[in-house]
Swiss-Prot record:
The name this protein goes by in its record: Large ribosomal subunit protein bL25
GO MF term list: 5S rRNA binding; structural constituent of ribosome
A Gene Ontology biological process term: translation
Subunit organization: Part of the 50S ribosomal subunit; part of the 5S rRNA/L5/L18/L25 subcomplex. Contacts the 5S rRNA. Binds to the 5S rRNA independently of L5 and L18.
Taxonomic classification: Bacteria, Pseudomonadati, Bacteroidota, Bacteroidia, Bacteroidales
InterPro entries: Rbsml_bL25/Gln-tRNA_synth_N, Ribosomal_bL25/Gln-tRNA_synth, Ribosomal_bL25_b-dom, Ribosomal_bL25_C, Ribosomal_bL25_long, Ribosomal_L25_dom, Ribosomal_uL5_bac-type
Keyword Amino-acid biosynthesis annotated: no
One Pfam family in the UniProt entry: Ribosomal_L25p
Function: This is one of the proteins that binds to the 5S RNA in the ribosome where it forms part of the central protuberance.
Gene Ontology cellular component list: cytosolic large ribosomal subunit
Tagged with keyword Zinc: no
Family affiliation: Belongs to the bacterial ribosomal protein bL25 family. CTC subfamily.
Length: 196
């Protein structure tokens, strides 16, 4: 898995919520993003610049984040992002500290491989789930989950329960459809004409 470095500055939390809201608003107005690191001995509140998060957030890849907070380095993963509902700017980011002995839960991108038999017959391949939720030790988690669809015929699907990857536990519903070859209107018309 790729890694990316993000530098932050620790911040203290105000005891009263009105002071906290004012402090967070000031951080955002100055081009910063309030962040929280969970999973360690204690919860760490820190601030990162918008530019420092750009390469981590706006990418199709998944990363192990080398967080440097006031000179102290920890490995973490991006757990959650909150965006402004109108401006689409980043409001808040949660990170989760990695423990090499404990499994983590992450969403991993899905990549389809091969030319499906159903596509050759006039169907259309549709990817229903772009990411799958997996649980494993962080050093086992791949950058992407590859699914070979060359055997997939017209009207056929690949479900989560049919997939297995060594060392990974898939957490999505077993009956959830990952990808399918759907009949196009042209293929339906040709099948109806052939049936007459």
């Amino acid at each position: 898995m790729r890694s990316i470095e993000v530098k932050g500055t620790a911040r203290t939390i105000a005891e009263r919520s009105s002071e906290q809201a004012r402090a967070l608003k000031e951080i955002r107005n100055n081009g910063g993003v309030p962040c929280v690191l969970y999973g360690g001995e204690e919860v760490v509140h820190f601030t990162v610049t918008n530019e420092g998060l750009r390469n981590l957030v706006y990418t199709p890849h998944i990363y192990v984040v080398d967080l440097v907070i006031d000179g102290k380095k920890v490995n973490a993963i991006l757990k959650d992002i909150q965006f402004h509902p109108v401006k689409d700017t980043i409001l808040h980011v949660d990170f989760y500290q990695i423990d090499e002995a404990k499994p983590i839960v992450m969403e991993v991108p899905v990549q389809l491989e091969g030319l499906a038999e159903g596509v050759k017959a006039g169907g259309k391949l549709a990817l229903q789930m772009r990411k799958l939720k997996v649980k494993a030790l962080y050093n086992i988690i791949p950058e992407k989950l590859t699914i070979n669809v060359s055997h997939l015929g017209l009207g056929k699907t690949v479900k989560v329960g049919e997939l297995s990857y060594e060392g990974l536990e898939l957490l999505n519903a077993k009956e959830a459809v990952v990808c399918a070859v759907k009949l196009t209107r042209a293929a339906r018309g040709a099948a109806a004409a052939a049936g007459k």
